[in-house]
C-alpha cells in the first residue's frame, strides 16, 4: 500500500513526438484497478540529453516544469536554459552528462499494489525507469 509513487526516468524522444503520449507508467492494484501516468513531451517527458525551449508556441506545456537530476553532478532543479548557461536558439539545448526527470503519481492508500509497468507507445522512443520510491 502507498499514497504516492515517485519515478526517476530517462528518455530519448524527438520533437516530432511532441504533445502525444510517448509512454505510460501503470500501477495495478490487486482488485484490478489501475493508475496511469501518461508521459507526454514536453509536459512531463524531456529528452535525457537535451532541455526544451518553452516559448508558448511550438513548445507550450500544460503542466509545471518537472524536477530534473543532472546525472553528471547529482544537482536537482527545475532547470531552464539560463541556469544551464545556454542561450536560446533554434539549435537543441544539449546537456553535458544528461538529465533524468522526476515525476510522481498519487495512489489510493487503502488499496494493495500488485504491479508496475512501463510501456512506450510512440515510435522511436526509449524510456528507462531508473528508480521508484513509494510513500506510505
Q: Language model features by range: what are they?
A:
Residues 1-4, 11-16, 22-24, 38-135:
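Beta-sandwich interaction modules
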Amino acid at each position: 500500500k502507498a499514497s504516492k509513487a515517485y519515478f526517476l526516468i530517462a528518455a530519448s524522444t524527438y520533437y516530432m513526438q511532441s504533445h502525444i503520449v510517448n509512454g505510460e507508467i501503470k500501477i495495478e492494484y490487486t482488485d484490478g484497478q489501475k493508475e496511469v501516468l501518461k508521459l507526454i513531451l514536453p509536459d512531463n517527458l524531456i529528452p535525457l540529453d537535451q532541455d526544451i525551449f518553452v516559448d508558448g508556441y511550438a513548445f507550450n506545456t500544460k503542466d509545471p516544469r518537472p524536477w530534473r537530476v543532472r546525472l553528471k553532478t547529482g544537482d536537482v532543479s527545475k532547470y531552464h536554459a539560463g541556469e544551464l548557461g545556454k542561450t536560446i536558439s533554434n539549435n537543441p539545448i544539449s546537456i553535458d552528462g544528461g538529465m533524468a526527470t522526476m515525476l510522481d503519481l498519487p495512489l489510493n492508500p487503502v488499496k494493495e499494489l500488485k504491479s508496475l509497468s512501463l510501456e512506450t507507445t510512440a515510435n522511436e522512443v526509449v524510456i528507462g525507469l531508473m528508480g521508484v520510491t513509494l510513500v506510505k
